[in-house]
Amino acid sequence: MTLLEQVQIRLQGEPKADDAAQLQVLCDLARVRICLRIREPTLPALLEPIAADVVVKLFRRWNYEGIASEGADKISTTFVEDILAEYDEEFAAYRETKEEESGEKVVRFL
């Protein structure tokens, strides 16, 4: 099942969820950002469920530009800075597992 198909199933019945072109753009965006985060050229199948979660969140925030909270009694808006931040532990675990499997250690100079 493709990433787009997973997202379409999760968003089934939601308004504007039938716009495959918009969903594909969001799938591509999520895929690229996750690949950059984990330093892999392609999205591993193991991380596709996370990518689907990210796309659903991006879709639901499309019209809100990443608003995390709003107050009704006063005008107050907080924006989400990094939608992938909540998955950092999973990404780190993936990278560690890949390093262990390959037997290579990565040294980074600051």
Annotate each language-model stretch with its function.
Residues 57-110:
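Short loop/turn elements at secondary-structure junctions
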Residues 28-35, 52, 56-60, 64:
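Amphipathic alpha-helical core segments of compact helical bundles
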Residues 1-49, 93-110:
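Conserved short "hinge" loops at termini or chain/domain junctions
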Residues 14, 18, 39, 54, ...:
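Generic preference for well-ordered secondary structure
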